[in-house]
Amino acid sequence: MRSRIAAFAAFTIFVASAALAAPVTYDIDTKHAHVGFEADHFGGLSKWRGIVSGVNGKIVLDTEAKAGTVELTIDPATVNTGRTDLDDHLKKDPEFFDVAKFPTATYKGTLANFKDGAPTEVQGNLTMHGVTRPVTLKILSFKCRAHPMMQDKNVCGADAQASINREDFGMTWGKKFGFDMGVDLAIQVEATTPKK
């Protein structure tokens, strides 16, 4: 009898451990996610800054295995620089987002280089303007906790940065005027587990 009880206890612990170690899927909170950008204007005279607020997707995190994935869908029509005329130009010009032809951008990557239980990079591919290129995100901050306002959920938040060359994606407007094609990105996301 004791051996059966011990075996059952061991099985219970194994199942519980497996459950704790299982990958957890977090849905992007669209109200707390955006991609910020900073781009050159006239070869270093000034900077264009803005955000793209239409970001959704999911993060799958397995802290035990130190692994996970990120999938983001980005709506370039939500670009906001604080200037309506510039926003319209960015949305419509064939050498910028051209949202009529390319209504979404996507980023798919793998969480990597975990330190103290948290990833420090995402190694993935960005598809934008019909072109796919490898882009690595450097994670500056990544934290998870019980949601402070929704007791049946957990929440993770992350800040990351990357640099791209927009010419790599066929977005070359301004090059003939001396614009640098480099763009710095600042990504902020929060993601929550689905309601239980």
Task: Label every PLM stretch briefly.
Residues A7-S17:
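Bacterial N-terminal signal peptides
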Residues A21-K196:
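Low-complexity, acidic/polar, glycine-enriched regions of mature
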Residues M1-I5:
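Positively charged n-region of N-terminal signal peptides that target proteins for export
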